[in-house]
Amino acid sequence: MSAPPENLMTESRNPASSHIDTLSTLEMLKVMNAEDKKVALAVELALPSITQAVDLISAAFHKKGRLIYCGAGTSGRLGILDASECPPTFGTPAKQVMALIAGGHRAILKAVENAEDNLQAGQSDLQNINFNENDILVGIAASGSTPYVIGAMRYAKSINAQVIAINCNPNSLMSKECDVNICAVVGPEVLTGSSRLKAGTAQKLILNMLTTGAMIRTGKVFGNLMVDVQATNAKLVERQKMIVIAATDCLREEAEKALLQCNGHCKTAIVMILTNTNTAQAKSLLAKNNGYIRQSIVK
């Protein structure tokens, strides 16, 4: 199933680092830094595909669908990292953005032998979370040929769910199994085949864009403020106050009072202040406008 390593750009040798073991520490790091600078440019070239993906994910969220990441090794762990940040950052339900990794939970901290080579496991893991046609799958694999991920993608397509691929090799196997193919061609790694480096960095940048873009599109952001942030610790309690102040240009005391009245619901506090309404009225305005602050404050 997997493409031979010699045919993959991510597995080829990088001439810029062919003698990296002979360099001073500073020169070694300069080589790495020079290669890392190429990553953002590679992601920039993929922006049209990333745009399509964000719009698909936003549409899925509007239909109460879930975003499911699927990957193996570094790719799987990056999916877990991004998914786990969504509830505290955007106030999403725990299962709105989920991540699957080949080998299951134990593979997060330790490599599980041959887990990524199991084509059927990808399908089984999706079935175990009741993946359906309203959900959207994002397969992540630097090589673009990981059997576990391809198995999941094929199952998702078989039930008419939409599928996005994130990879770093042109014309990969994954590109033939998806609706949108995001290919960030970062080139050979500084350490041959170590796709946790440039490929992993590119994947993280893309995942940042997917969730952040989709959350903006679904009303989780006002201006550039995280208005659905959950106050789960002292730092975030303070951040909520600063968000309300920034959004409304009110005094600190007014922000604290509004947040207290609406039990720490940032959006409600902002709408209360900007529309001069009480908690119930502000909540009603938000409900009528699907949680979008900007529409809720239009007079």
Swiss-Prot record:
Domain SIS, residue spans: 57-220
Gene3D superfamilies given in the database record: 1.10.8.1080, Glucose-6-phosphate isomerase like protein, domain 1
CDD domains to which the protein is assigned, alphabetical: SIS_Etherase (cd05007)
One MF term in the entry's GO annotations: carbon-oxygen lyase activity
Pathway(s) of this molecule: Amino-sugar metabolism; 1,6-anhydro-N-acetylmuramate degradation; Amino-sugar metabolism; N-acetylmuramate degradation; Cell wall biogenesis; peptidoglycan recycling
UniProt key word Repeat: no
Principal EC category: lyase
Keyword Transmembrane included in the entry's annotation: no
PANTHER family noted in UniProt: GLUCOKINASE REGULATORY PROTEIN
Assembly description: Homodimer.
Protein family (similarity comment): Belongs to the GCKR-like family. MurNAc-6-P etherase subfamily.
Additional remarks: A lyase-type mechanism (elimination/hydration) is suggested for the cleavage of the lactyl ether bond of MurNAc 6-phosphate, with the formation of an alpha,beta-unsaturated aldehyde intermediate with (E)-stereochemistry, followed by the syn addition of water to give product.
General function of this protein: Specifically catalyzes the cleavage of the D-lactyl ether substituent of MurNAc 6-phosphate, producing GlcNAc 6-phosphate and D-lactate. Together with AnmK, is also required for the utilization of anhydro-N-acetylmuramic acid (anhMurNAc) either imported from the medium or derived from its own cell wall murein, and thus plays a role in cell wall recycling.
Annotated protein name in UniProt: N-acetylmuramic acid 6-phosphate etherase
